[in-house]
């Protein structure tokens, strides 16, 4: 679980950096299911279903932070699975955002590294959380 914890921590750091950039540059969420307004980005980050055009909302990041801290300790196995599912939702979120897809098509040095790294770490988080084998009781 320590590898998952480290990947999740790195992903959380990238997410906070992209959230900061999205708020500063007023990048609203823009998915096939809805569109935000640039002036509402900071407010939308507090809505658990919205977020910004570059980051998940604060409640999701708070849940990830709690799960990550639990993984560094003795967490039940369901925490790893939950973090894997969170990684899957981040993959979907990243790829559904117009600003992220645009940064892949037209790379720039400020946005693309964050979006690529966030997507890769989300994939790693999903794989390491969901591909874990359960150990039989009494074994190390």
Identify the function of each model-found stretch.
Residues 1-140:
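Short amphipathic, positively biased membrane-proximal segments
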């Amino acid at each position: 679980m320590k590898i998952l914890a480290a990947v999740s921590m790195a992903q959380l750091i990238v997410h906070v950096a992209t959230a900061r950039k999205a708020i500063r540059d007023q990048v609203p969420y823009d998915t096939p299911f809805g569109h935000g307004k640039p002036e509402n980005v900071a407010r939308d980050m507090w809505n658990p279903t919205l977020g910004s055009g570059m980051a998940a909302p604060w409640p999701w990041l708070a849940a990830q932070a709690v799960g990550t801290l639990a993984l560094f300790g003795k967490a039940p196995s369901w925490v790893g699975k939950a973090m894997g599912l969170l990684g899957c939702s981040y993959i979907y979120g990243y790829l559904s955002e117009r600003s992220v897809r645009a940064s892949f098509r037209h790379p720039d040095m400020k946005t693309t590294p964050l979006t690529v790294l966030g997507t890769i770490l989300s994939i790693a988080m999903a794989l390491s959380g969901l591909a874990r084998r359960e150990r039989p009781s009494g074994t190390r």
